[in-house]
Amino acid sequence: MPGKPVNLASPNERKLNFWERLYLPAVVQGLAYTWRKMRSPRYTFQYPDELWYPPDSYRGRPVLVEENGRPRCVACGLCARACPPLAISMQAKEVDDVKEREPAWFEINMLRCIYCGYCEEVCPEEAIVMSKEYDLTFQSRDEAIFGLEKLLVPAERLKDRLEWLDRYKDPQYGQHWEFRKENNLHSLKDRPFLKWLLEEEGMEELKSTHLRPEEPVAAERSWGGVRAEG
């Protein structure tokens, strides 16, 4: 014998009247809400005639900072190692400069990039940053692979993002550590300091080891560390 249907309605549940069973009040309420929203300010843009300008914290496509006509990047490879979708690849080359290395070629596959910003977080030179560019179109897969010619952007155009990074880093570390540029005196970001050493101190050449002692420090001697020569 099939079971009898069970009424699951609560005994205290209010029964709908005739108009409510027709759902007309709900329809009128929906139309009234739509009419109110039609008269409120619009949130949409008439793209492409009107463009949206993102805030400084926006994570658009990653770009490389170009400083004095050269990439700030030292080709350390940290961004490529930190990239979750493995979208970044590069090859380093030696250069006659205080930074010693820069990328011979640098590529980002924009079809793989997820705009997470990890590359920007780990970069010790602030050489790769997230721009405000969000409108990307490609006609083929080859066009989606950006090389140095598409990635390099002058530092002046990225001033807002670089200043935002300086404000952003301090609160991240809280009371444990304060981000200071002078902690990185050997890096490309501190060219004024290096120029001062060359001109004021009369140094004919600047070695990458000039800011540290030639002999191993106490912490290195404890495990037998030896400084490599030149």
UniProtKB/Swiss-Prot annotation:
Residues 60-93, 104-133 form the 4Fe-4S ferredoxin-type domain. It is found in: Cell inner membrane. This is NADH-quinone oxidoreductase subunit 9. One of its GO terms (cellular component) is plasma membrane. Binds 2 [4Fe-4S] clusters per subunit. Its cofactor is [4Fe-4S] cluster. It comes from the Bacteria. NDH-1 is composed of 14 different subunits. Subunits Nqo7-14 constitute the membrane sector of the complex. [4Fe-4S] cluster 2 binds at residues 83, 113, 116, 119. Gene3D superfamilies: 3.30.70.3270. InterPro entries: 4Fe4S_Fe-S-bd (IPR017896), 4Fe4S_Fe_S_CS (IPR017900), NADH_quinone_OxRdtase_chainI (IPR010226). It is an enzyme of class 7 (translocase). The lineage of its organism: Bacteria, Pseudomonadati, Rhodothermota, Rhodothermia, Rhodothermales.
